[in-house]
């Protein structure tokens, strides 16, 4: 029905894998995305890209006139997830839950999570999701304790560049590249592990 593709405001946050998929699938740069379908916002002091809704219905820019997704194969993780949600346990993991009243489409049928998400290597993907969530949580804490505003701003821009603006090598495994960047970022801002 595509109701979840309309009126979402700036809530469709994009993670590094989403940007990787979009830039690879659309054969463009992060800057190209910023000039067309992505915008930046500050959330809890963290610079985050999100999908930029368009028109009077505030719809996803990739929703076609028939109400179908033009980028379904490379759609963002939050779009893949809906109407599921994630509950993070605080110990490095998470569980899925079904938002039973959020999706208006009927009838609903049982689908395995790995099939619903439609990602290859579900274990590696879930590991990435957890790592990214907990890294952001730790980074917010560390950056929140720094009193020098100019340094905090510099570190936020560093993270934006490292995880989003700096192109990923499409000939190399995304997860390995992300891991390398994650370790670099942790070291740079002083997160253990």
Language-model regions: role of each:
Residues 1-193:
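Short loop/turn segments that flank or connect secondary-structure elements
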